[in-house]
């Protein structure tokens, strides 16, 4: 049964991670993030075709979620690694932000593991006081693990050791073009723009730690869900194996009220899929302005 939370238009359903060894990745997320398996199997050919990634057919997948929740957060899909791919250096989905109960406890859980800490915990003001840290995983996927210090009711409020995905960070060569795409195709609304010393991004590009970088928030009908980063000079298109999803953060899935209202070109015509998280609902995928893969699932 598909949880009610996943049915709300504008919500992020989950992110799909392309990982070279699914057993290793699942064990790491279970041990360090305390995520649990919801469902496992192999990608069926019609679903792979809907992603514009026919080579993904037959690949093993695992759907994972916080142990204390009945919703989804991550779908791991096993793929061959792509050479010459470095985290936070290419366009597309650059990072995922997950809410945590205690960033210090998470820091203890991930240190000296296959996660690489690229930014230790620190306090910042981002609308409200938060304490984030940043890590990269064995597939070179990047997570921002964020504790909200004055929590209110909302998707960023953690109710588990590591809880839900609440912001997807998009790396772009042209932020304005990316913002226009989501406004036109999905009806998302442009939010505030921020300039800040972006520690993890500056580190990836060898820039001084206090170098100012700029990003803009995008809001869906129900919440702010995408952070659109303008990437520095030197960023490149993400390398892609033919017929596969992009490496690391391969795709992010959102709920929409109707696929018929989407103003974009799908890889394949919308189709119904029975496995979680679709539950018989229609889904389709398309490519965004920065080369990112976007999956859309109808609310009903």
Give each language-model segment a name:
Residues 52-56, 86-88, 134, 158-159, ...:
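Short glycine-biased active-site loop of nucleotidyltransferases that positions the nucleotide triphosphate
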Residues 23-43, 84-93, 105-116, 176-196, ...:
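Extended intrinsically disordered, low-complexity coil regions enriched in Ser, Thr, Gly, Ala
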Residues 217-219, 231-234, 239-240, 245:
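Glycine/small-residue-rich hydrophobic helix-like segments
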Residues 12, 92-95, 165-166, 247-249:
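Eukaryotic phosphotyrosine signaling hubs
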Residues 45-50, 81-85, 151-155, 199-203, ...:
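A short, acidic/glycine-rich surface segment
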Residues 1-8, 14-17, 40-41, 72-77, ...:
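Vicinal oxygen chelate
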Residues 54-55, 61-63, 74, 82-90, ...:
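Post-signal peptide N-terminal segment of secreted/secretory-pathway proteins
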Residues 17-70, 123-126, 171-223:
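Core segments of cupin and vicinal oxygen chelate
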């Amino acid at each position: 049964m598909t949880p009610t939370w996943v049915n709300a238009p504008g919500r992020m359903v989950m992110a799909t991670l392309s990982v070279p060894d699914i057993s290793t990745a699942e064990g790491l997320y279970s041990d360090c993030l305390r995520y649990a398996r919801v469902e496992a199997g192999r990608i069926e050919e019609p679903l792979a075709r809907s992603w514009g990634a026919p080579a993904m057919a037959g690949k093993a997948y695992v759907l994972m979620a916080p142990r204390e929740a009945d919703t989804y957060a991550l779908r791991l899909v096993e793929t061959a690694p792509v050479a010459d791919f470095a985290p936070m250096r290419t366009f597309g989905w650059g990072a995922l932000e997950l809410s945590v109960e205690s960033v210090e406890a998470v820091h203890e859980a991930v240190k000296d593991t296959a996660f690489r800490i690229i930014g230790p915990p620190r306090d910042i003001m981002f609308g409200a006081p938060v304490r984030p840290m940043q890590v990269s995983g064995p597939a070179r996927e990047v997570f921002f693990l964020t504790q909200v210090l004055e929590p209110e009711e909302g998707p960023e409020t953690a109710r588990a050791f590591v809880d839900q995905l609440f912001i997807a960070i998009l790396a772009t060569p042209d932020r304005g073009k990316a913002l226009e795409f989501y406004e036109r195709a999905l009806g998302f609304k442009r939010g505030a723009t921020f300039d800040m010393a972006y520690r993890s991004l500056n580190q990836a590009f060898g820039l001084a730690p206090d170098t100012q970088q700029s990003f803009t928030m995008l809001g869906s009908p129900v919440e702010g869900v995408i952070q659109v980063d303008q990437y520095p000079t030197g960023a490149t298109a993400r390398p892609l194996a033919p017929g596969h999803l992009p490496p690391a953060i391969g795709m992010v899935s959102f709920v929409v009220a109707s696929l018929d209202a989407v103003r974009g070109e799908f890889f394949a015509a919308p189709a119904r899929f029975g496995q979680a998280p679709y539950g018989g609902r229609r889904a389709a995928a398309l490519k965004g302005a920065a080369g990112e893969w976007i999956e859309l699932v109808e609310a009903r």
